[in-house]
UniProtKB/Swiss-Prot annotation:
The gene is ZNG1E. Zn(2+) binds at residues 107, 109-110. One of its GO terms (molecular function) is zinc chaperone activity. It comes from Homo sapiens (Human). This is Zinc-regulated GTPase metalloprotein activator 1E. Residues 8-20 have a biased composition (Acidic residues). GO terms for biological process: protein maturation.
């Protein structure tokens, strides 16, 4: 088991780890269930957060509460795990066997010791018995790595889609975790989890003064200017706030357009820490030039700021206008992976086309990135060669 960080009271309340009441799963489906599952993609929501933040509490709440949602929950545990894991995971011949159990409120649950990919593949055999999938990561995991598997596994992608990333932050210890300095300039895990989130739950707000919650909220906003922040106690949250987010698909186009107009730029809360920058550039970009701009940032990693530090982009989101396309295009990026997808929203003939981008990362320089994007739209090669250092690739 991975060692806990901090004092013992950071850990989850043992009572909250108890296994929910289980009933045997039915192996047959009704015709209605089978029909409802055919041809429909299932949304997957990633639940992440530092050790003791309240991930298990949230999942136990979902698994036991009466909420009319049919949710499949995949618990990702390391080492000995909790009573919940011991009840759900069976090891045979040294290999893990996933046992899916149906709970009294209609939800499904299993526990795995790997990245959850195999569990999801097995779960799809029960398609029609659930409407949503929640995938928990370990406390020290980088959710970006888990996110990427939904983009690179084409076969799996035919059945599911990534709906969003939920990060839970402990009110009592969150500020300590987010400001912890790592050796060699590495980004600490808690900060990276917040940077990638679409929804941030500040949990256990009843355990600290209101002033401490405000400080934590300010720090979170300084890291991620795009995600929605919610305050909770004992991880109790309206499921409508964490499900059906459509944070990674074209259905978010309309709401994203409004949201990007109000995303604040942020200042780092520590030297060389993660910030959010946003800018708007009018015009149309050729798709090949847009790809080159993104690939230099995410793949080649050869873009540097005024201090000659490498820019590291953790999350990229935006709406762009591509030449010869009548639809607005949403761009999404997580670490090295990115995607361009047309939205249902068309550009109006009487309005100027524009591009709005939000980037979350480290050592980001808004002026340089905006200049590079202007060069992308106007096809000005000089601006590109000034800041793309092909012989000085960042590692």
């Amino acid at each position: 088991m991975l060692p806990a960080v901090g004092s013992v009271d950071e850990e989850e309340d043992p009572a909250e780890e108890d296994c929910p009441e289980l009933v045997p799963i039915e192996t047959t489906q009704s015709e209605e269930e089978e029909k409802s599952g055919l041809g429909a993609k299932i949304p997957v929501t990633i639940i992440t957060g530092y050790l003791g933040a309240g991930k298990t509490t949230l999942l136990n709440y979902i698994l036991t509460e009466q909420h009319s949602k049919r949710v499949a929950v995949i618990l990702n545990e390391s080492g000995e795990g909790s009573a919940l894991e011991k009840s759900l995971a069976v090891s045979q011949g040294g290999e893990l066997y996933e046992e899916w159990l149906e709970l009294r409120n209609g939800c499904l649950c299993c526990s795995v010791k790997d990245n959850g990919l195999r569990a999801i593949e097995n779960l799809m055999q029960k398609k029609g018995k659930f409407d949503d999938i929640l995938l928990e990561t370990t406390g020290l995991a980088d959710p970006g790595a888990v996110t990427s598997m939904f983009w690179v596994d084409a076969e799996l992608g035919s059945d599911i889609y990534l709906d969003g990333i939920i990060t839970i932050v402990d009110s009592k210890y969150g500020l300590k975790h987010l400001t912890e300095e790592k050796p060699d300039g590495l980004i600490n895990e808690a900060t990276r989890q917040v940077a990638l989130a679409d929804i941030i739950l500040i949990n256990k707000t009843d355990l600290v003064p209101e002033e401490d919650v405000k400080k934590l909220r300010t720090t979170i906003r300084s890291i991620n200017g795009l995600g929605q922040i919610l305050e909770t106690q004992r991880s109790r949250v309206d499921l409508s706030n964490v499900l059906d987010l459509h944070a990674f698909d074209s259905l978010s186009g309309i709401s994203l357009q409004k949201k990007l107009q109000h995303v604040p730029g942020t200042q780092p809360h520590l030297d060389q820490s993660i910030v959010t920058i946003t800018f708007e550039v009018p015009g149309n970009a050729k798709e090949e030039h847009l790809n080159m701009f993104i690939q230099n940032l995410l793949w080649e990693k050869n873009v540097r700021n005024k201090d000659n530090h490498c820019m590291e982009v953790i999350r990229l989101k935006g709406l762009v206008s591509i030449k010869d396309k009548s639809q607005q295009v949403i761009v999404q990026g997580v670490h090295e992976l990115y995607d361009l997808e047309e939205t249902p929203v068309s550009w109006k003939d009487d309005t100027e086309r524009t591009n709005r981008l939000v980037l979350i990362g480290r050592n980001l320089d808004k002026d340089i990135l905006k200049q590079l994007f202007i060069a992308t739209v106007t096809e000005t090669e000089k601006q590109w060669t000034t800041h793309f250092k092909e012989d000085q690739v960042c590692t």
